[in-house]
Amino acid sequence: MAVISMKQLLEAGVHFGHQTRRWNPKMAKYIFTERNGIYIIDLQKTVKKVDEAYNFIREVASEGGNVLFVGTKKQAQDTVKEEAIRAGQYFINERWLGGTLTNFSTIKKRINRLKQLEKMEENGTFEVLPKKEVIILKKEMTRLEKFLGGIKDMPGVPDALFIVDPRKERIAIAEAHKLNIPIVAIVDTNCDPDEIDYVIPANDDAIRAVKLLTGKMADAILEVKQGEDNVAPETTEEVVADAE
């Protein structure tokens, strides 16, 4: 059975592409028809592609890999954060900082600085420092949290990227390509599908569409995690019996 139904996709408006004058000819194979100057995406293909993406993300999770959710456009920011957190993964929903993947060691230094400032706030250091200095430090902490909060616990470069709107996330895609990190993405009719390993042809501007598809990718990770939670731990007796 498909991960997602045609009915769910229709209700979320996943089928609405961009205006016909704003399109990438490489997306032609995913277009069903044109209506009132707007391309309509072939949802039968979307259903199939969601299945492929879901299975890939599930595979990454089953091997203990990490997925970085990326969506900095307004319609994606809240969803990307919520779904990544729900799946116990990482996210970037503000500006992508150049070098986030290709220069992760430098980014890690900024993350360590953020953690240092958080610790200073927690252990009361801010209370004994001059007021002016505290204002400057808090400002720095807020800025670092804004851009790096979603990846501050990410142990290293992720094993896969999930992206909402590849046109918006050009730098993220270029960095992932350099490091051979596979990309899953919601790809609208104005995008280049050749840049993406797992294309999900869909409307990337409607909040409901973004939420539905991003939620399914989070579900793939949770399916693995819940499966692990349901595996009963071996008892001491079983371990001893196996040894004998």
From Swiss-Prot:
UniProt key word S-adenosyl-L-methionine: no
Residue pairs linked by disulfide bridges in the UniProt entry: none
Record gene name: rpsB
Gene Ontology CC annotation, any one: cytosolic small ribosomal subunit
Pfam families tied to this protein: Ribosomal_S2
Position of the signal peptide: none
The UniProt record lists the keyword Ribosomal protein: yes
GO molecular function: structural constituent of ribosome
Cross-referenced InterPro entries: Ribosomal_uS2, Ribosomal_uS2_bac/mit/plastid, Ribosomal_uS2_CS, Ribosomal_uS2_flav_dom_sf
Domain of life: Bacteria
GO biological process entries: translation
Protein name: Small ribosomal subunit protein uS2
Keywords: Ribonucleoprotein, Ribosomal protein
The family this protein is said to belong to: Belongs to the universal ribosomal protein uS2 family.
NCBIfam families linked to this entry: rpsB_bact
Organism: Exiguobacterium sibiricum (strain DSM 17290 / CCUG 55495 / CIP 109462 / JCM 13490 / 255-15)
PROSITE patterns with a match to the protein in the record: RIBOSOMAL_S2_1, RIBOSOMAL_S2_2
